[in-house]
Amino acid sequence: MKAVALRREAASAEALAGLVLCYDVRDAGGRIVAAKGARLDAAAAAAVLGAPWEELHALVMEPGDLHEEEAGARLARAVVGEGVEVKGYTGGQWALAATRRGLLTVAREPLTEVNAREGISVFTLFDGQPVEPGEVVARAKVTPLVIAADVVAEVEALARAAGGLVRVR
């Protein structure tokens, strides 16, 4: 990824398309026209051009980069083990929920290895804690807006080798 700062006079829909925004872009009334982290398509680029701004900060995705949502989805799928499912994405985090009543088992060593990777965060309830169906037992998050696919692949391999980082038995 590469960070760029675009001046309004140099901006066009073509120049904006594909960029990832570093912050919300608002119209004159204060309404968000394009949210932080959005990867601009033609329609979003046109909306951004219609908003009042002088300089726009964004990220250019390069080959081998993943957007935070795609990377987070992959992370979440790798983290879940037996008795846990990916529930949904909200607030930049993927919720992981129990599919049955039981005790939460956390693979602590692999979890520590995963969390040692810059830009990756997986946080859980306590190992051995009783949980109910539908209860969120962990959350997975990719903190940068764009991350190297290699980092995500390493984490996937660690989590899968452990049979998932969180399980309900």
Q: Where do the PLM segments sit?
A:
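Helix-rich terminal scaffold detector
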Residues: 1-17, 159-169
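Anionic-ligand-binding alpha/beta catalytic cores of soluble enzymes and soluble regulatory domains
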Residues: 59
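N-terminal glycine-rich anion-binding loops that anchor highly charged ligand groups
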Residues: 14-24, 38-53
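Short, glycine/charged-enriched hinge/interface segments at domain edges or termini
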Residues: 74-169
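Feature captures the catalytic cores and cofactor-binding loops of soluble hydro-lyases/lyases
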Residues: 66-69, 74
